[in-house]
From Swiss-Prot:
<dbReference type="Pfam" id="PF00551">
    <property type="entry name" value="Formyl_trans_N"/>
</dbReference>
<keyword id="KW-0808">Transferase</keyword>
<dbReference type="GO" id="GO:0004479">
    <property type="term" value="F:methionyl-tRNA formyltransferase activity"/>
</dbReference>
<comment type="similarity">
    <text>Belongs to the Fmt family.</text>
</comment>
<dbReference type="InterPro" id="IPR005793">
    <property type="entry name" value="Formyl_trans_C"/>
</dbReference>
<dbReference type="Pfam" id="PF02911">
    <property type="entry name" value="Formyl_trans_C"/>
</dbReference>
<dbReference type="InterPro" id="IPR041711">
    <property type="entry name" value="Met-tRNA-FMT_N"/>
</dbReference>
<dbReference type="InterPro" id="IPR037022">
    <property type="entry name" value="Formyl_trans_C_sf"/>
</dbReference>
<dbReference type="GO" id="GO:0005829">
    <property type="term" value="C:cytosol"/>
</dbReference>
<dbReference type="InterPro" id="IPR036477">
    <property type="entry name" value="Formyl_transf_N_sf"/>
</dbReference>
<dbReference type="InterPro" id="IPR044135">
    <property type="entry name" value="Met-tRNA-FMT_C"/>
</dbReference>
<dbReference type="InterPro" id="IPR011034">
    <property type="entry name" value="Formyl_transferase-like_C_sf"/>
</dbReference>
<keyword id="KW-0648">Protein biosynthesis</keyword>
<dbReference type="InterPro" id="IPR005794">
    <property type="entry name" value="Fmt"/>
</dbReference>
<feature type="binding site">
    <location>
        <begin position="110"/>
        <end position="113"/>
    </location>
    <ligand>
        <name>(6S)-5,6,7,8-tetrahydrofolate</name>
    </ligand>
</feature>
<dbReference type="InterPro" id="IPR001555">
    <property type="entry name" value="GART_AS"/>
</dbReference>
<dbReference type="InterPro" id="IPR002376">
    <property type="entry name" value="Formyl_transf_N"/>
</dbReference>
Length: 311
């Protein structure tokens, strides 16, 4: 039985961990995840999905603020693990820890070398990629730069957003890891170096990148909106207030970018640089998320054709 330390944080990682727990070829000696955080306006302390999964399985849990140089790292090195599996952990692993293991692999939610970094699923959508995927790779000091052990792709559909693609790729990552790990541990797979000329980076989304620029095409804005749904959520400004847009569809239309072209009972169409967007799910300032019909029947009922959204 191969003894593992698992490291991860969000739901994506929890799905991978649960997959490993179903396979009797592996024993999880410890789980490392990010510390509990205060979230929301009420600052409620929230455990990571990986911590919740580990607690349900009765596993030992470590939550160092920073792994490098921590007492927790020294403890982990004394457990006698054969290797480390990480999936969206959110911290760099120290070379000292990596060097103490027979192997260390990462489950990364992109088709490397494209989309290295912390937001690969977001950028796959924002940049209009036709496919997404998962790469199992060896861990090295440089971020997402290790040799590739295996890759698996799935198509991106127009119905996908960050939430749906996360769910799909979590299952792909779980299955690909379980399919790959035995042969890799046995030495039957020769990892492939990444083509550095094809590397792109997908860092965490910055707040200023959440703003919609109506001078882009309807397709570009459609991809940005779904590439930030359900988090961090794209926004524009309407009458000076922040206006979040969760869902919109590209449609035909022509006008000044940001101009309201049409208002119906269940329709609000806004011009872009090329074509238009039909807004479907929005959140006005100080209000909950709602469908466009609810918005137009409520706080949006005073809108008129010709008014403009800011960016």
């Amino acid at each position: 039985m191969t003894k593992l330390i698992f490291m991860g944080t969000p739901d994506f990682s929890a799905t991978v961990l649960k997959g490993l727990l179903t396979d009797d070829r592996y024993e999880i000696l410890a789980v490392v995840t990010q510390p509990d955080r205060a979230v929301g306006r009420k600052k409620v302390i929230q455990e990571t999905p990986v911590k919740q999964a580990a607690k349900e399985a009765g596993l030992s849990i470590y939550q160092p603020e920073k792994l490098s140089g921590s007492p927790e790292m020294e403890e982990l090195m004394k457990l006698g693990a054969d290797g480390i599996v990480t999936a969206a952990f959110g911290q760099f692993l120290p070379s000292k820890l990596l060097d103490s293991m027979d192997f260390a692999v990462n489950v990364h939610a992109s088709l490397l070398p494209r989309h290295r970094g912390g937001a690969p699923i977001h950028y796959a959508l924002i940049q209009g990629d036709e496919e997404a995927g998962v790469t199992i790779m060896e861990m090295v000091k440089e971020m997402d730069a290790g040799d590739m052990i295996s890759r698996r792709s799935i198509p991106i559909t127009d119905e996908d957003n960050v939430g749906t693609l996360f769910e799909k790729l979590a299952l792909v990552g779980r299955d690909l890891l379980l399919d790959t790990l035995p042969a890799y541990i046995a030495g039957d797979i020769k990892p492939e170096p990444q083509d550095t000329s094809q590397v792109t980076f997908s860092p965490n989304i910055k707040p200023e990148e959440e703003k919609l620029d109506w001078n882009k095409t309807n397709r570009q804005l459609f991809n940005q909106i779904r590439g930030m749904n359900p988090w961090p959520v794209a926004h524009a400004f309407l009458k000076g207030d922040r206006f979040k847009i969760y869902e919109a569809l590209p449609v035909e239309g022509q006008g000044n970018p940001g101009e309201i072209l049409s208002i119906g009972k269940k329709e609000l169409i806004v011009a872009t640089a090329e074509g238009a967007l039909s807004l479907k799910q929005v959140q006005p300032a100080g209000k909950p998320k709602m469908d466009i019909a609810s918005f137009l029947n409520g706080v949006g009922r005073t809108l008129t054709v010709g008014e403009r959204f800011g960016d």
